[in-house]
Amino acid sequence: MMELLAPAGGYEALTAAVQNGADAVYMGFGAFNARRSAKNFTDEEFASAVRYCHLRGVRVFLTLNTLLTDRELPGAAAALRKASAMGVDAVLVQDWGLLTLAKEIVPDLPLHASTQMSLFTLGGANAAAALGMERVVLARELDRDEVREICAGCGAEIEVFGHGALCMCYSGQCEMSAVLGQRSGNRGACAQPCRLPYGVNGPCRDAHPLSLKDANLSAYLRDMSSMGVACLKLEGRLKRPEYVAVVTGIYRRLLDEKRLPTAEESRALEQAFSRSGFTDGYWLGRKGKPMFGTRPENVPEPKELFARARETYENGKENRKIPVNLRLTVRRGEPVRLGGACAVPGGVTIVMATGDMPEEARNRAVTEEELRQRLTKTGGTVFAADQIEIDLDEGLMVSASAVNALRRELLDELADRRMDTPKRRELPASPLPEAPAGAAELDFTVSISRPDQLTAELLAERPAIVYIPAELLDKMDLTPYIGQAEFCAVLPRIFRTADEPVFRDILQRHPEVASAAIGNLGHLAIVKGLGKTLRGDFGLNVYNSRAVLFWQEQGLSSVTASFELRWQQVRDLGKYADCEALVYGRLPLMITENCVTKNSVGCAHGAGSVLTDRRGEQFPVLCAYGCRCEIENGKTLVLADKPEVFRCGLRYGRLRFTTETAAECAALLRAHRAGTVTADDNSTRGLFYRGVE
């Protein structure tokens, strides 16, 4: 049966999830998880939570799914070791450096690819499986046919998001909260700017064009199960325990009874939490305005619903009784023996408790029924006597206290065995290699977004690399420019399995394009065997030195540093590979499956629109591959007038052209070459000096 995975943002939510039927829970401890504002767990609480869950047959997944700096990796390594020793069943990861570290130091600990890894194709899922991921959490934007295709072709388990909040941006690719407020969604500190009002091609009023309704896929569980989805995930580590109880309980019943939700259950889900109702738009492939909604302020608490929910888990309520088979032997001349058997992970365990010799009855002999009644008294434990066998010689006496003591001893031992932690290896981390000599003098590269931006005037300024969106190559003639720069095809950050052969064909048709920019793990399947030089784009979220080394092992000759990093952190990355950073241009804040422009003012046929926030700041909305949207920062990044750019070990500084004219592109590269770049009121330093939380 498909696993039901529930959120546990704190201990009360954990008990709510377990007592309402979760097969597994996901939770975090420490700072390294994607919901840092959840209560989370101390080390002691987490160890206790693991024992609580394992005793009841519930698996525990630790969320270490954030991006980490070099200085944070030792702390994350310590968390991995603790998790392995505590018996955690799997760890969710996003960071490429943490992935390699985990495989080194706790090689027996199962790893799951977080949705923050931005995996949405069969090639990406299989690449994750080849890296040792036992499970892949797919992007929430996939429709059911796409999920079915990945389930059928992937060697790893597939986890699908079933209920709860939807981000507007693809997980792992959102920089809006980071760039605007230094709170990184990639580090568990998202400020949720998508829930705020914005105007589209006009002033900000009361519209919320980035606020998606919560997903509710309760009507499609049989569909998911039949296509091979291994796990259904419920969102809500920031939600109340009562919410967790309500949602988990309903989904548990739907899975067990293989049915659709009743009208009452649907109302309960909406009462527990919703934003103007729910959406199943992505699952059905129906994008558009009906998917969007808001939650009014001061929504009254559903007191009656939540009161009933609390009754399911408060005051030591135990809904998950573990069946145990008991056999009591009372014979003359032999010690009283109580044997018991119950399920444990991987099989069945058998325990024997031995007491004193039975006595000859002086008045009345003990009966089989009396012994049976004493053995059924398992209250206060998670066990329930299922089958009881009694082998009793006539005329003997065994006290109630003796039978009770044997029962307690046996059940305690069974509990200990269910909570046993697996024996796992723990190995030292390999040291980072000796850093080679620093990079050569920084050179400038450019990326264009329209064919008209590539001109002879631009190439006259000698860019080291010209990045061109791969989907534009068939519309451009690069023949006149061969030899003037390295042309690099930029594969789209967001694409689908059906696009893999399309882009492979494009790359094969253009031998004049020497290299390809990789922005997603799934791109490796597209470029394999083509002989192109591979370069890492910013979509990879390269955050630390081990991530740099990981991508070197995948064949990349250069990487682009995450633009969330401060210049000192970028300097650390440049020690191990040719490193590139954005030094000019609009920073991409979001890439979205829903089209902001079409939903608000109608399709602009590639022209895009402008988003305006409450303070009057304007953000260009550009058309991205596949009729997706990319929201750009309103201010332009300018860094090349700062000396730190040239002192932080960068091999390349990229000028990212989006809204610029062809003449502006050439003039800007000329100014960078001449060292005459200046910042003004419409520019920003990005996060180069500020960094993020």
Predicted regions: what they are:
Residues 1-119, 137-141, 146-231, 238-693:
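Active-site pocket-lining/capping segments in soluble small-molecule metabolic enzymes
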Residues 134:
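Long, basic N-terminal domains or extensions that often function
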